[in-house]
């Protein structure tokens, strides 16, 4: 009997020894446990770019959905979203709070080029994932120098080159006026546009005027741009100022060929406040499905988005593509977390973010999401579209790779 008891004890020890490696496979950095994943976010719920607050609310609602359905690999996502008012100094304060006090595993979708620029070095020094930032500045795709920061949407310079190509093809003798926000965001778009026009930039662009994000309106800039005699207008503005520019152009009776950067293309947040009639004919580039477009208001993808909006985000505007954006970018992070499995270290989060190859339900047909160790630009395809008074009408080819 003693021999049998000893044998059983030895067998039990052997089983425990065999189980140890399996238990050890779970790896966590701060912000992750068996039950929870802390995700930090900074969004302008107040201030001059508060229209973008819709994105943060949409993301939060999507994580409510994820958690209600069991979480990611059995873990709840704790989404902590703070307001910075689109003020870079406040962004720094909020980032420190999230990283050092809340101890989030990663930062996700912090919005705006100036705010993200203010914490760019901090996030990389701390080696905290600075993932899928809500800005298309070209500098977010630099894994060699900033391995902890990754963009999500198409980069601004590439988008601006699409508008330049369309102008050169359709109005080779255009007289172009440009309004841009005087910061990294505006200058990035402007550089891409000038590069896209090439040698013709100096002769085709007849007026370039900037505004400050603290300006109350861009009315005076619009008066000056009209006076330049331009027949083509590139509008590089955030939603509040985009709506003002569209409205003022109509008041002035100025009807140029109007190109609007994609970051302000939301029908609900921009075009409706600006005036539907005033917005007629505007051209922009898109990569996500416009919820006002009848061709996309059918099928499982639409039904799923609509069900999410009705159940988890009933206060959200069904005409606002910021709610499609938030839903889609949140799905991207969920995929990264799924791939990470039980290895929820910051290093593995970045490894998984840099190994994506997927499509998502509300991306435009032909647009995919792909990354690699040397490719931190997840979405690189866009298509031009024109506003017809009700919705954006897609036209032409898909640009990008």
Predicted regions and their residues:
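Sec/Tat signal peptide C-region and signal peptidase I cleavage site
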Residues: 18-24
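Immediate post-signal peptide segment of exported/extracytoplasmic ligand-binding proteins
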Residues: 24-41, 68-76, 168-174, 343
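Beta-alpha junction/loop-to-helix N-cap segments that form part of ligand/metal-binding clefts
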Residues: 25-28, 36, 51-57, 69-142, ...
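Extracytoplasmic "Venus flytrap"
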Residues: 28-36, 40-60, 82-89, 111-112, ...
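Extracellular/periplasmic Venus flytrap/periplasmic-binding protein
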Residues: 89-93, 100, 138-141, 146-252, ...
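Periplasmic-binding protein-like
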Residues: 98-111, 131-133, 176-180, 229-239, ...
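Extracellular/periplasmic periplasmic-binding protein-like sensory domains
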Residues: 249-325, 398-400
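Segments of small-molecule ligand-sensing domains
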Residues: 311, 316-323, 334-392
